[in-house]
Amino acid sequence: MKTVFTSILVLAAIIVNGQVKDAKATALLDEVSAKTKTYKTIKADFTYTMENKQAKINESKSGVLLVSGDKYKLTAAGQTVICDGKTVWTVLKESNEVQVNNLDNKDDAMTPSKLLTSYNQNYKATIVRDKGNTDPNAESIELIPNVQKNFIKAILTVDKVKKQVKGFKLFDKSGNIFTYKVTKFQTDVPSTASDFTFDAAKYPGVEVIDMR
């Protein structure tokens, strides 16, 4: 689960920090950014696959991400990560425990709310052809970090008509390839503050591990 969540936040960091040299890529990301800022909430259902040919690993799972401002709730792989903008609760279903941490705003540990909000010079991006992409409305952007990161590159796929992220591939230094595909994208979904806070009453007998 840590890998899943880290990869999603890396995607956020890529888009946030993606100062690009390709004019076409710049324009497209600017348009997606502007569109994203108009949403009060975003709910995305997604599937993800981790592949490592050398280690003969090929695992697939699914999840749901709900975002509202600095707050988010991610459910995937038997775990739920909840953040109210300051505190992060990681609920482990199998062991019936919740780990409590302060939100880390350093480096790539960024909140999904920072998606598409500003740019700097941490990435070089270029429009590329993705052989696996058959959607005529989709555009693929290769992003290579200019500073040291725990991944080599990412390929972001964007719907150039709807101005929405369709998915991305993340290639790390261990030979792992993480592929994420958005299967359902909803905007301005009704939500309340309780969606982004941990309620122990919903998890009878849960063990609380405060790591702050």
Task: Write out the residue ranges for each language-model feature.
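Bacterial Sec-dependent N-terminal signal peptides
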Residues: M1-K21
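Flexible, processing/modification-adjacent segments and terminal tails
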Residues: V20-T41, D45-M50, K56-N58, T87, ...
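Beta-strand elements of well-folded, non-transmembrane domains
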Residues: M50-N52, V67-K71, V147, K160-K162
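Solvent-exposed loop/turn segments connecting transmembrane beta-strands
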Residues: Q54-K56, G78-Q79, G175
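Short beta-strand-initiation
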Residues: S60, G69, A76, F151-K153, ...
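An acidic-aromatic
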Residues: S62-M110, F178-T179
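Gly/Pro-enriched, hydrophobic low-complexity segments
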Residues: A125-V128, T134-P204, I209-M211
